[in-house]
Amino acid sequence: MTKSNGEEPKMGGRMERFQQGVRKRTLLAKKKVQNITKEDVKSYLFRNAFVLLTVTAVIVGTILGFTLRPYRMSYREVKYFSFPGELLMRMLQMLVLPLIISSLVTGMAALDSKASGKMGMRAVVYYMTTTIIAVVIGIIIVIIIHPGKGTKENMHREGKIVRVTAADAFLDLIRNMFPPNLVEACFKQFKTNYEKRSFKVPIQANETLVGAVINNVSEAMETLTRITEELVPVPGSVNGVNALGLVVFSMCFGFVIGNMKEQGQALREFFDSLNEAIMRLVAVIMWYAPVGILFLIAGKIVEMEDMGVIGGQLAMYTVTVIVGLLIHAVIVLPLLYFLVTRKNPWVFIGGLLQALITALGTSSSSATLPITFKCLEENNGVDKRVTRFVLPVGATINMDGTALYEALAAIFIAQVNNFELNFGQIITISITATAASIGAAGIPQAGLVTMVIVLTSVGLPTDDITLIIAVDWFLDRLRTTTNVLGDSLGAGIVEHLSRHELKNRDVEMGNSVIEENEMKKPYQLIAQDNETEKPIDSETKM
């Protein structure tokens, strides 16, 4: 009895303290609201102008797109209407190539071999961990929801699929890592093509009566052959930046410059200036981004197929993918960030809002890269040495959303075909989906191409990819947003884990963060500081 009586006052005291804390916070909030002035509102709107304009563009673009759908615009009219959005894509893609090279070279050159090795290892561990988690989430969700019930006969097909073997796709990945021509790597990627070739194969005789006849004819005609056709792999290429090859070269080049010490100072300063110039161009383009995103989204909504095409199975498949991506993006990634850094992930994500909306509009993690740099460095204060190293690599190989989508889509196609997958085949899908997501370049709808590898690994029909193309334009935007979020949170995690190495590097270089900020101050501010110091000096002399 005494124990329970003793606990009641304690519980009452805790409740009173909790209520007092709530009252204090409420009063503080009321005072802040009452003290808000027009200048405060103006400063808030100015600070968050980019984000507010981008969010408004998404809302207006969606409304405009659905408003124009009943008018049944022609293909030419849609292209004219989407032209402002096309301009935004071209502007961003124009900056991707110099940004990847300059940021990686300067990032690697600013770190010593020990620090860059540790940072690289942490980034790779993060990439592999989140990708594997994404694949597991996709597999579990699609097995639980089971969107592929029924038959595929009534489902709408769209487009054609180019077949590629897993071995050739893997070899293409390795080949693209080491481009023979750096100039060509700026606009072309190696890709194995297939062509039919005819071969003459001698007919083998057996011991039967027919074999005896063939032997006699063969002796008379010297040889008897049959012609067979076979698909043979031949070297080829496709248009597009070979980002993987440029990333590998830039990392190696930056590492060498960093080890050259004073001899590499001129190159280090050149690439640092190039990176700064590119980021200033990004700052200009960001003002145009809301306009481009508005027309990109509106144009895609006008262009998309009739919603009646999306049947029950495809609708359930879409919902399943969205649920999987939400679990990974809203629960897993923020939780991982909180567990490692012990910081509020939503404050960090709030600083990324414009990059995430840009990813939603452009459906390309590479095209979003300039905006992602800007958000991480200016809004979230992530060290430039980390962003320059982690972001270009992440945009190339870290694609959580794509990995989740490929594993989920493969099992959905198996369900549609009433194909029972055993445990070994599910493991095979998880491994190939992880590997294929690494090989998927940061370009729109790359997941559809690499999904052929996943389906081939377990013997599923690759033609059935056409069943999901009708909704891929929408899902591609969602998984791109997830990819960008994963890269950005990864930069925050790697910076937190590498903070000691970064501080030690600052001490070694005699270039602390405070000194660096002082060097970057405008001339007028430095002059003002000097003027304020003069009276103090005169007083001391007196």
UniProtKB/Swiss-Prot annotation:
* Residues annotated to bind Na(+) 2: 396
Catalysis performed (reactions): K(+)(in) + L-glutamate(out) + 3 Na(+)(out) + H(+)(out) = K(+)(out) + L-glutamate(in) + 3 Na(+)(in) + H(+)(in); K(+)(in) + L-aspartate(out) + 3 Na(+)(out) + H(+)(out) = K(+)(out) + L-aspartate(in) + 3 Na(+)(in) + H(+)(in); D-aspartate(out) + K(+)(in) + 3 Na(+)(out) + H(+)(out) = D-aspartate(in) + K(+)(out) + 3 Na(+)(in) + H(+)(in)
Pfam families, per the entry: SDF
InterPro entries linked to this entry = DAACS (IPR050746), Na-dicarboxylate_symporter (IPR001991), Na-dicarboxylate_symporter_CS (IPR018107), Na:dicarbo_symporter_sf (IPR036458)
Disorder noted: Episodic ataxia 6: A disorder characterized by episodic ataxia, seizures, migraine and alternating hemiplegia.
Q: How is the quaternary structure described?
A: Homotrimer.
Name assigned to this protein: Excitatory amino acid transporter 1
Q: Which organism is it from?
A: Homo sapiens (Human)
Gene for this chain: SLC1A3
